[in-house]
């Protein structure tokens, strides 16, 4: 059996290298100086991986672009926040690689009706969400197909969204004067260098992830992934990849919130991944790590190459994804449960109606 998920993960360093320059050019095309300076508050939204990318890039927009930013899931934004947007300076980025997710389309549409300037990060200018916004940032980086036609958990699409968000944050920062031209170039070079960091992380983490998958193969209960700041987005994303790849119950949690909630969970040896960038999150991660050990958790920290926290999701997500890929292969578990048991990939997500849900005006 070919490990298609692992094969996709192995392509991520080259993907970063391939899209870095064209995505920077795309950000430059959309965000001119006047547009960038007009941003009073930025809202980023999406569903699933796209929502996690919004969370993972929030720090970049605040730190590099100097823009107050809120990352929200599409349901919350569309049905609750869109009615109360600022009357001036609201800019809204909807993230949807497929471009067909109803709730995200609804969110940017409702924001536009209320005077916000709207954007889509999507795979082409012809997707449904592209038709619903004023500006389109195209991320032409589809998941690698395979001859077997297997639906594989998405990693390339997530990385493409992150790269476009990071490129946009840097360029907006330069246009607003939050970054000098020299500083912007330094940050672009730092972002490009994550390709090497990702490759080094794969080399370090792949054997360890495989060994961990073998050692925990009989474990049948929850898996927990913890992170903070950008890596809270990573934690949510990695839990999603576990669910998709293996079907195991998995959750992403903020490091601080773990101490308030999962600390009291009954089961002792729960595999608990601590995903730390070693910067703003470092002191609290160390405290919580001690608490995890004290109550018998199986604390997991797979090896990775260091990376600035603002771009850490491009590196930190790789080791847990490799673990999920290896576990699925060892279990012989079909991705997405093969869309069986009442699940369906047809008709816009089957009964879940991801793409056919009724849209609110």
Write out the residue ranges for each language-model feature.
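A contiguous, mid-protein "functional segment" used to position or interact
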Residues: 310-336
């Amino acid at each position: 059996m070919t490990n298609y998920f692992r094969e996709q993960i192995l392509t991520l360093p080259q993907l970063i290298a391939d899209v870095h320059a064209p995505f920077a050019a795309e950000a430059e095309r959309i965000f001119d100086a006047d547009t960038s300076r007009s941003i009073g508050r930025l809202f980023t939204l999406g569903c699933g991986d796209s929502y996690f990318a919004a969370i993972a890039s929030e720090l970049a927009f605040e730190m590099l672009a100097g823009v107050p930013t809120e990352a929200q899931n599409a349901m919350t934004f569309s049905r609750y926040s869109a009615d109360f947007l600022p009357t001036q300076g609201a800019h809204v980025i909807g993230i949807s690689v497929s471009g067909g997710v109803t709730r995200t389309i609804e969110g940017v549409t409702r924001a536009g009706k209320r005077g916000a300037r709207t954007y889509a990060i999507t795979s082409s200018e012809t997707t449904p969400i592209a038709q619903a916004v004023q500006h389109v940032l195209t991320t032409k980086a589809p998941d690698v197909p395979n001859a077997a036609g297997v639906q594989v958990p998405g990693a390339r699409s997530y990385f493409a969204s992150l790269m476009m968000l990071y490129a946009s944050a840097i360029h907006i920062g330069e246009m607003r004067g939050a970054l000098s031209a020299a500083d912007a170039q330094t940050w672009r070079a730092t972002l490009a260098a994550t390709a090497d960091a990702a490759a080094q992380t794969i080399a370090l983490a792949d054997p360890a992830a495989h060994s961990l998958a073998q050692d925990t193969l009989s474990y049948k209960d929850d898996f927990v992934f913890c992170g903070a700041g950008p890596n809270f987005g990573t934690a949510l994303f990695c839990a999603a990849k576990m669910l998709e790849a293996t079907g195991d119950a998995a959750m992403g949690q903020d490091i601080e919130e773990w101490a308030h909630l999962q600390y009291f969970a009954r089961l002792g040896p729960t595999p608990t991944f601590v995903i730390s960038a070693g910067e703003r999150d470092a002191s609290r991660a160390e405290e919580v790590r001690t608490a995890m050990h004290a109550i018998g958790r199986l604390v997991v920290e797979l090896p990775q190459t260091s990376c600035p926290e603002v771009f850490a999701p491009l590196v930190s997500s790789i080791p847990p994804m490799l673990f999920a890929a290896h576990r699925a292969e060892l279990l012989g578990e079909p991705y997405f449960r093969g869309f069986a048991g009442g699940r369906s990939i047809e008709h816009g997500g089957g009964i879940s109606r991801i793409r056919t849900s009724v849209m609110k005006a």
